[in-house]
């Protein structure tokens, strides 16, 4: 039975990798067709990939409440998508605290875990209810 489950898991992982590779190829093709006038580097973010990754993470660990580190990508749309997918957030600066307020997240679920906190940032976090 264990071997059958391992083989099934391997096939699912292989299909998942193939779908991911196809999605990546489509994104590269799309970007290539739309970036002829750009010379500077750019970051392209897939909303569907963000949503899928958030859902997969939550499904894999249903008892865990994931907290996205805002410093990893503070773009408002990324934060909005993760909020809509039910993720919580971890902040490390006044700007990130303010982003949470602007996004109207449940402040009680926000972690403020910067190991080096200025008095001003501690005051701001306290004022925000973190």
Where are these regions (language model features)?
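A charged N-terminal "starter" segment
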Residues: 1-130
